[in-house]
Design a protein with these regions (language model features):
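Gly/Pro-enriched, hydrophobic low-complexity segments
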Residues: 19, 77, 142-244
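N-terminal mature ectodomain segment of secretory-pathway/periplasmic proteins
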Residues: 24-99, 132-137
C-alpha cells in the first residue's frame, strides 16, 4: 500500500511540475513577441490599415505612444475624422453627424485613463499594473486548441459605478500568442453581450510580432475586420497631433 501511495504521489508531483502556469504562458508570450527588452524600447507605434465598409476600402491611421496618448484617423469621402483620441488629459473624437470634434464624457475619459498603461499589450508588466491572472481549463476556439486566461484589470466605470474589468484571453497552445480576447459589454444598448476581438496573420516587424488582421464582433456574430498594411515604431510626434482642436 505504501508503494502504491508513493507512486500516486510521484505521478501527482510530475503532473504539477509539467503543467503550465498563467505566468509561464505570459512569459512565453512576451518572449515570442520579441522579448521584454525589445518591447520596452518601443516608445511609439503607427499602424496604417484598411477596413472594408459597404464595398469601400477605408484607410485608417492609428498612432499610440507609451505614455498613453493615442489617436486614430479615418479618411472617408475626402474627409478626415478622428476617433479614440486621448492627449493625456482629454479624450475626444469626431462626431459623425456634425463632423466636428467633441470631447467625450467624464466616464469615458476616466476609463481611457485607467487603461492608458496598456501600450502594446496589457500583459507587459501586468504585475506592476496590479492585474491578476487565472488559468482556466483549455478550450478550442476558432478551430485552435488554446490556453484560456482570465485577466482582471483595474475596475472600470459603468453608469457611474466601479465594476470588475475582466477579459478572457485565448492563447494558441503552439505559438503562445492570443488569437481571441473576450469581454462583457458593461453599458449601453449591448450591455451584457460578449464582445470578441479575433487576431490573426502574425508578422514580424523590426523584431517584434504583430497581428496584421483584427476582427471586432459580438460573440457568434459577424464582425468588422481591419487589415494592417504597415507598422512603424519610434517615430516622433508633436503634441498637437493628439490635442483636442482649439486647445
Amino acid at each position: 500500500m505504501k508503494i502504491v501511495s508513493l507512486v500516486v504521489a510521484f505521478i501527482g508531483l510530475s503532473f504539477i511540475s509539467s503543467a503550465q502556469s498563467a505566468e509561464d504562458i505570459i512569459d512565453k508570450y512576451i518572449q515570442n513577441l520579441g522579448g521584454i527588452e525589445k518591447l520596452n524600447s518601443i516608445k511609439s507605434i503607427e499602424m496604417k490599415a484598411k477596413v472594408d465598409y459597404g464595398g469601400m476600402s477605408i484607410p485608417i491611421q492609428m498612432i499610440s505612444l507609451r505614455d498613453g496618448r493615442t489617436i486614430s484617423k479615418i479618411s472617408f469621402q475626402g474627409q478626415e475624422m478622428s476617433q479614440g483620441a486621448y492627449d493625456g488629459t482629454t479624450s475626444w473624437g469626431t462626431n459623425f453627424m456634425t463632423m466636428k470634434p467633441e470631447k467625450n464624457d467624464a466616464e469615458t475619459t476616466e476609463n481611457v485613463k485607467r487603461q492608458s498603461s496598456d501600450f502594446m499589450t496589457p500583459m507587459l508588466d501586468y504585475k506592476t499594473k496590479g492585474y491578476t491572472l487565472e488559468l482556466l481549463p483549455n478550450e478550442t476556439i476558432e478551430g485552435v486548441e488554446c490556453f484560456k486566461l482570465k485577466v482582471t484589470k483595474k475596475p472600470q466605470l459603468a453608469e457611474g459605478k466601479d465594476i470588475p474589468n475582466v477579459e478572457f484571453y485565448y492563447f494558441d497552445k503552439e505559438n503562445y500568442v492570443p488569437i481571441v480576447v473576450e469581454a462583457e459589454i458593461p453599458s449601453g444598448q449591448m450591455k451584457g453581450q460578449i464582445s470578441q476581438t479575433v487576431f490573426s496573420d502574425y508578422q514580424e516587424v523590426q523584431g517584434i510580432f504583430f497581428p496584421f488582421s483584427m476582427t471586432q464582433k459580438l460573440k457568434d456574430g459577424e464582425g468588422q475586420t481591419i487589415v494592417f498594411e504597415s507598422i512603424e515604431m519610434n517615430k516622433a510626434y508633436e503634441d498637437s497631433v493628439f490635442k483636442f482642436p482649439g486647445e
